[in-house]
């Protein structure tokens, strides 16, 4: 590769003095830690890790037994056509059957639980490791629905779930993607499977509020089993004046049900796209326009997977690390990645997006707008798209000679390569000295460019051994003035 000779690009007298971590790195670092769990209290309550929250959801010890020892809980279910014999003695008012819409949405809710754990659901009058039933009631007891935990004792009513429908409450008549009726179905099926509320409260028993929560993450941003708004944990699922809800288990629910019955790694084990151009075959994972409302925690069994949020026009923050949250499509903290899940790629939209990769080789595309992109570890492909984009590197190990990142569309005078948070600059204040070739001094940098191939590179010797400890390659030419330290 030939080296550009212009002094504005490579000169023995060109040097950059460290100015400390930049505002771009500050935004990356702040968002990367915004949803950290454990440790210090949040909202005056203990902050629970995913495992702690999962254990608390399972604290009542209720579970179905694997009767045939095949490693899977197989449940049959029916939609009741008449009230059970003790229905009226329980003060439930008038019985009614599920409508076709309710049946279809209940099946989708069950499917979302089967996706994440070793549980199957079959419509049949009986059979399997246990039986579930669905029905409507009319007498309000303060709750919109209720279900029974699977305790193995006489009169436990395990498997039953009931949904309120009367002249004053119609939400359960129209369940659908992202609405409260669908969330209610998913919540009650969670009880039937063995999950409790994240706190010791129940609808109809006093007037519980978030103040009664045991731990900070007891909100609908983390669990469909919670009663409390996601706003309590700094999230916001409101868009275009409407409140939206998860249609499937969220991060803590997924961890809990997998502790109980095991994880379903067969689910989406190939290359899966979530968001626009989705092939996940689930309504809650699919976006079709910038007005789409996504609220989900992704469970994925393997493959090379992509968050495609390219059709959104709003400013977005996308984090590919497991147990992280992202701000997608104008909402806040509405998309998360379940524990144990790896998503390799992320595509931003036309807003000013912030993208954070993980330790693997990611493909990160900012799209239009002035984007900030941090690949993290691994040999990443970074696309800024149109606009003035900043490519941030926080450690020497983020892009090495053995696994260099490649910036696929660098535009000099517009884009930036931000090295300001690398400790040699941020802490040790090592000047960055541009040279034509390494001479054995720490802090030397070589900018190279081949006009014929339009490929360039930035190599830095941090140890003074005349070898590149840090290497990032570019499609397009970078100048000294494009580097930030």
Swiss-Prot record:
Binding residues annotated for Ca(2+) 5, in chain numbering: 367, 369, 371, 384, 386, 389
Positions annotated to bind Ca(2+) 3: 349, 351, 353, 366, 368, 371
Record: residues binding Ca(2+) 1: 268, 270, 272, 300, 302, 305
Binding sites annotated in the UniProt record for Ca(2+) 6: 376, 378, 380, 398, 405
Observed effect of gene inactivation: Inactivation of aprA attenuates both the capacity to persist in the host and pathogenicity. The deletion mutants are able to survive to wild-type levels in immune-deficient Relish flies, indicating that the protease plays an important role in protection against the Drosophila Imd-dependent immune response. Moreover, they persist less well than wild-type bacteria in imd flies over-expressing Diptericin. Pro-Monalysin is found in supernatant derived from the aprA-deletion mutant while the mature form predominates in supernatant from wild-type P.entomophila.
Cofactor note: Binds 8 Ca(2+) ions per subunit.
Residues the record lists as binding Ca(2+) 7: 385, 387, 389, 415
Annotated Zn(2+) binding sites: 187, 191, 197
Induction: Is regulated by the GacS/GacA two-component system that controls P.entomophila pathogenicity. Also seems to be regulated by PrtR.
GO terms (BP aspect): collagen catabolic process; extracellular matrix organization; zymogen activation
Database matches in InterPro entries: Hemolysin-typ_Ca-bd_CS (IPR018511), Hemolysn_Ca-bd (IPR001343), MetalloPept_cat_dom_sf (IPR024079), Pept_M10B (IPR016294), Peptidase_M10B_C (IPR013858), Peptidase_Metallo (IPR006026), Serralysin-like (IPR034033), Serralysin-like_metalloprot_C (IPR011049)
Names of required cofactors: Ca(2+); Zn(2+)
Protein residues bound to Ca(2+) 4: 358, 360, 362, 375, 377, 380
Entry keyword annotation includes Hydrolase: yes
Source superkingdom: Bacteria
GO molecular function: calcium ion binding; metalloendopeptidase activity; peptidase activity; toxin activity; zinc ion binding
Gene3D superfamilies, per database record: Collagenase (Catalytic Domain), Serralysin-like metalloprotease, C-terminal
Binding site for Ca(2+) 8: 461, 463, 465, 467, 469
Catalytic site: 188
SMART domains the record matches: ZnMc
NCBIfam families registered for this protein in UniProt: Zn_serralysin
Alphabetical list of PANTHER family matching this protein: MATRIX METALLOPROTEINASE, MATRIX METALLOPROTEINASE 16
The family this protein is said to belong to: Belongs to the peptidase M10B family.
Function: Secreted protease which is important for P.entomophila to counteract the local immune response of Drosophila. Can degrade antimicrobial peptides (AMPs), e.g. Diptericin and Cecropin A. Thus, protects P.entomophila from the Drosophila antimicrobial peptides produced by the gut innate immune response, and promotes bacterial persistence in the Drosophila gut and killing of the host. Is responsible for maturation of pro-Monalysin to the active toxin Monalysin, by cleaving its N-terminus.
Protein name (record): Metalloprotease AprA
Lineage per the UniProt record: Bacteria, Pseudomonadati, Pseudomonadota, Gammaproteobacteria, Pseudomonadales
